[in-house]
């Protein structure tokens, strides 16, 4: 990218309006430009015919619409798409699209790698490099919309849902993720409703509180264990933010919208967290929580120590939760033949750091930059 030019994908509508005013342009031009970029899917300013030649020339001199580069695309036997996207820094991230009869869900990454080191997740094994910019996050949506369009041009409505469940912990890239989600929900851009944009977090409590105040999106929590002892092993951030604090926040997260529920994701690991006593502990943990539970069959990756629970074990676990009034769904595994399923996204991370260094890096970034700190079925985000 030309360092002298501004990447317009980093701007939401109000920011774009302010930018054009600063460039001595009429404010209404922002709506036209915003729609050209996100609704129509045009990058070439010369093709934005209603902007006027003078403005088009100015945009060519001052601005750009830079995107990650698609370096590989795989399509699963079940129709799932996975794109490997190369960033300007040379790192790669992955984005996944899951088609279903009445909707299409895009799984979007928020970081290059991940710092949280969940033991059952392939992304964690890649180390952590950096946060994605707003442009790199919304660029995944832009590219997927283009690739999925019938004529490989005008953006259509094949993407009906977006889940921030790709590589990284979204809440450790708070400002950029919220900015990108706001663009997703803008009627002048992608027009997704608040119930069709879901953020999945491992439980970064201060940022969960912030998110609750500033964004109406759906919330999913990567729970995966019913006790602190087990969750400390599977999801190490639990040592900092234990279950008692996490569940307390989840109980009141949608207090002003009593019909909305927090989704709890629970990967089923053979002999680890899938026994009847674990189900009983989970029932007790979620008592009086407005919750639904997604049971996720574990998706293996190279050198993992874990195995997937049997179908019979998963069904028995689900039935026990349902018997006690907890709405529970077993997630259908999609894209596992191309390593696009939940927990399998890895990308390609350069300059990988150790676990302790990752935390130090995030801690430093959070002090200096406010912006620091998979597959899914149709029933899960309705």
Swiss-Prot record:
It catalyses: adenosine(2503) in 23S rRNA + 2 reduced [2Fe-2S]-[ferredoxin] + 2 S-adenosyl-L-methionine = 2-methyladenosine(2503) in 23S rRNA + 5'-deoxyadenosine + L-methionine + 2 oxidized [2Fe-2S]-[ferredoxin] + S-adenosyl-L-homocysteine; adenosine(37) in tRNA + 2 reduced [2Fe-2S]-[ferredoxin] + 2 S-adenosyl-L-methionine = 2-methyladenosine(37) in tRNA + 5'-deoxyadenosine + L-methionine + 2 oxidized [2Fe-2S]-[ferredoxin] + S-adenosyl-L-homocysteine. GO terms for cellular component: cytoplasm. Signal peptide: none annotated. Keywords: 4Fe-4S, Cytoplasm, Disulfide bond, Iron, Iron-sulfur, Metal-binding, Methyltransferase, rRNA processing, S-adenosyl-L-methionine, Transferase, tRNA processing. The active site is at 94 (proton acceptor), 342 (s-methylcysteine intermediate). [4Fe-4S] cluster binds at residues 114, 118, 121. It is found in: Cytoplasm. One of its GO terms (biological process) is rRNA base methylation. S-adenosyl-L-methionine binds at residues 168-169, 200, 222-224, 299. It comes from the Bacteria. It holds the Pfam family RlmN_N. Binds 1 [4Fe-4S] cluster. The cluster is coordinated with 3 cysteines and an exchangeable S-adenosyl-L-methionine. Disulfide bonds join 107-342. Its main location: cytoplasm. It is an enzyme of class 2 (transferase). Its EC number is 2.1.1.192. Residues 100-336 form the Radical SAM core domain. GO terms for molecular function: 4 iron, 4 sulfur cluster binding; metal ion binding; rRNA (adenine(2503)-C2-)-methyltransferase activity; rRNA binding; tRNA (adenine(37)-C2)-methyltransferase activity; tRNA binding. Its cofactor is [4Fe-4S] cluster. Specifically methylates position 2 of adenine 2503 in 23S rRNA and position 2 of adenine 37 in tRNAs. m2A2503 modification seems to play a crucial role in the proofreading step occurring at the peptidyl transferase center and thus would serve to optimize ribosomal fidelity. Reaction proceeds by a ping-pong mechanism involving intermediate methylation of a conserved cysteine residue. Belongs to the radical SAM superfamily. RlmN family. This is Dual-specificity RNA methyltransferase RlmN.
